[in-house]
Amino acid sequence: MQGFDQKFRDLPDYILKITYQIWEDKDVESIREYYAKGIPVRSPAGVVYGPDAVVKATYATLEEFPDRQLLGEDVIWIGNEHDGYLSSHRILTRATHLNDGVYGKATGKNLIYRVIADCACKDNQVYDEWLVRDQGAIVRQLNFC
């Protein structure tokens, strides 16, 4: 893939490897390498801009769920080297609510839920992302409803 690091075979390999590096390897600072300056990351909670905001949110999530795993189930994609690529990454997430945070006081409960991350990528960077997390599954497993 022109413009991407040689270690990536294709776009699914890129998406899966950077996700693993950020979350399983806990290399949160690598977001600054892989996310473009000014990137919008959209979710039902709102929009954040730039790698600094993504790094901050990632650290906050890892503080609340330090054992969080993002198990990539599938990446569908389209695109080319000239125009860039679009991906949709289906993820199964496992985590334990070990510390206080956005979901309240730590419960110690084990969670399993799904996430969809849709990314636009070019030249070894994600430059636009839509992120949807199954909040309903999370709150049900935490007994909030």
Show where each model-derived region lies:
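C-terminal and inter-domain tail/linker signature
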Residues: 1-145
